[in-house]
UniProtKB/Swiss-Prot annotation:
The lineage of its organism: Bacteria, Pseudomonadati, Pseudomonadota, Gammaproteobacteria, Lysobacterales. GO terms for molecular function: single-stranded DNA binding. Residues 5-109 form the SSB domain. Homotetramer. This is Single-stranded DNA-binding protein 2. Keywords: DNA damage, DNA recombination, DNA repair, DNA replication, DNA-binding. Residues 105-164 are annotated as: Disordered. A motif (Important for interaction with partner proteins) lies at residues 159-164. Residues 111-122 have a biased composition (Gly residues). Transmembrane segments: none annotated. The keyword DNA-binding applies. Plays an important role in DNA replication, recombination and repair. Binds to ssDNA and to an array of partner proteins to recruit them to their sites of action during DNA metabolism.
Amino acid sequence: MARGINKVILVGNLGNDPDIKYTQGGMTITTISLATTSVRKDKEGNTQERTEWHRVKFFGKLGEIAGEYLRKGSQCYIEGSIRYDKFTGQDGQERYVTEIVADEMQMLGGRSDGGGMGGGGERPQRQTSQRQDYAPRRQARQPSQSPQSSPPPMDDFADDDIPF
């Protein structure tokens, strides 16, 4: 007999860059703030939007990947479970926090150049080194193919254009 199901699926956009921390044992814990927006019509037929903010945590290897590639404004798909925790604050008051513990993550709406920096790329050194890693492999395979023009870069927007 099943004891219950705790499954959460979210598709949304990051409200800020990931917060990356490490345990004493070296495990990565990455926390993001993810916005999801639902749309419905009210009694008068007017469109109403409601945005919910979710605190999502990634652990271990998934935390490393999320911290490396997700950025403010990035869109992603997340599967995980919901967790409610209670703690005592510095003022002695009991506080409650609701978090999504991610088991799976898929980046959506990313850049076509393989950089994965969907939200603006504030770590250009890593992005550049990744492009260098990819370039020799592509060139090694292309001589047998007819010459093709490369797709235009998608750097034609600024972080200020993203509403998050």
